[in-house]
Amino acid sequence: GDAYVNKDFDELKKAIVADALPKNIAGLQRDLGKYRIKYDVWFHESDLHSSGAVKAVVDKLLETGACYKAEDGAIMYRSAQYAAKYGVVNKRKTDDGSEEEAKDEVLVRANGIPTYFAADIAYHYNKLATRGFAKAIDVWGADHHGHVARMKGAMDAIGLNGEDLDVVLMQMVNLMRDGQPVRMSKRTGNAITLTDLLEEVPIDSARFLFNMHDAGSGIDFDLDQAVKTDNDNPVYYVQYAHARICSILKKMESEGVAFAGAEQVDATLLTDPSEMDLIRMLAAFPQEIVMAAEKYDPSRINRFVID
């Protein structure tokens, strides 16, 4: 309104951010809540700057020699030197998609403004050193794969252990309808949000189908399949099997059939090889849960249940 007319640019920017940021975050939390996801902590990058955490990290890197001041006043980080331990290649992609020799990277520009990389380092230092987490698990888009070694190397440079940072690289999701990709473009505003998707697809179907593939595999999300209520839809297939099992257990209970312990079971009654195969497979389920956790791959659970 009129209150903003005579403000200078910096004041106007602060006022807009102060008004818009809480609303945007509330919207994200609302949408994620519909998908049954709750984040315990929402961390603001701006806090790293306002608290002096970014400057402290850069100063520390200067003290150790991992950074130096260039002739134009920019602060450069010896990225290739520290990333080499983690197998970084000697080339990197530029903004236009071409490749160039890997070289030292800017942490603070000549005009004094820190880069995103400086804030990234400060965040991980905050998590692992200041807040004392034993492990940091990042989820990035697969197009950032070239940054993994650089980030791990930066952890070493700052006095932490790069091995304490695990990065899960996620591939893209393609929405399909009638066997064809649904065309989307951020530039034209033609995009489908998670909220849009959940207005069309049941939440159980969305969660199950998204979790059918490991992070490294691209996902073709079939919108037609997701709304089916037959065995073509894996989530319906699994829910039907679960309902049948519950029905059998309920019938046993109503008829007074006791659940015997393993030592009381007469295994000689199991004459069909498929019965033993099923028992062996069920016995492997606890270990499958452990593997899913250790490998950051919950899709193993979905695939196990379908099998």
Region locations from a protein language model:
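Non-catalytic interaction-recognition regions
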Residues: 1-307
